[in-house]
């Protein structure tokens, strides 16, 4: 003797079959909105520089931070990024810190770092990263691939705005003492951007004080558009 199928279950199965027939796709796929994430980090530590002369490379602490980023990726704690951007070392101001910060993890992932954009091309970088993220999202069946950007901290508020966030937090200056924070955005293949909760590298160096924003505030007079707001 066959058991009677409860009416609620029968209705659910019928609806699922109907949706599948109408769309040509499994019903579960219809609940997915393809997206990718963009993660933004600052370069690793540099040498103490009271004279404000240009520092090109990472300090030993910065090198250790770069190695920790590789560990985060290879251990599965962080995404296996499918695209990595860094400030071009061959464009003004010719710094290598951003590239050096992501070089170990890029090597571990066997991907080439995109250094097509210099530090003064933040908006062009944002547009390219957005295109890359949307392309990855559309091609990756809702598994939420990720893109990583290593950028100079005073220009990160401008990068946030170029990615579509103009809230108070996105306009806030990045502390001169903070090497650990991570900004995250979700980019949808069909358009639209969500700001995700920030996270951290978990390596220390995320301290701040009311006096830790002088570098970025000073840069406003040197580079129009870096109008970040100190959070005090």
Give the residues covered by each predicted segment.
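Short SAM/SAH-binding signature in class I
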Residues: 145-148
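N-terminal signal peptide
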Residues: 13-29
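Short beta-strand segments
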Residues: 150-152
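Classical eukaryotic N-terminal signal peptides for Sec-dependent ER targeting/secretion
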Residues: 1-10
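Compositionally biased, intrinsically disordered/low-complexity regions enriched for serine, proline
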Residues: 3, 23, 194-195
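Active-site-proximal alpha-helix that buttresses catalytic centers in soluble enzyme cores
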Residues: 27-143, 155-232
């Amino acid at each position: 003797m066959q058991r009677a199928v409860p009416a609620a279950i029968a209705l659910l199965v019928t609806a699922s079959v109907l949706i599948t027939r109408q769309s040509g796709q499994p019903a579960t796929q219809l609940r997915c909105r393809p997206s990718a994430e963009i993660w933004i980090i600052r370069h690793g530590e540099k040498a103490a520089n009271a004279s404000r002369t240009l520092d090109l490379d990472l300090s030993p602490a910065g090198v250790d931070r770069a190695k920790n980023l590789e560990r985060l990726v290879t251990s599965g704690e962080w995404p296996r990024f499918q695209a990595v951007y860094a400030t071009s070392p061959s464009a003004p101001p010719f710094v290598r810190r951003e590239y050096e910060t992501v070089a170990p993890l890029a090597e571990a992932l066997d991907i080439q770092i995109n250094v097509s954009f210099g530090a003064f091309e933040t908006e062009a970088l944002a547009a390219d990263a957005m295109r890359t993220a949307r392309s990855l999202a559309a091609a990756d069946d809702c598994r939420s691939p990720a893109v990583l950007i290593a950028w100079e901290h005073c220009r990160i508020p401008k990068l946030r705005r170029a990615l579509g966030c103009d809230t108070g937090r996105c306009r806030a200056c990045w502390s001169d003492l903070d090497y650990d924070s991570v900004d995250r955005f979700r980019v949808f293949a069909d358009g639209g951007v969500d700001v995700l909760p920030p996270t951290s590298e978990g390596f220390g160096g995320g301290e701040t004080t009311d006096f830790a924003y002088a570098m970025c505030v000073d840069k406003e007079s040197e580079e129009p558009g870096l109008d970040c707001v100190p959070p005090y």
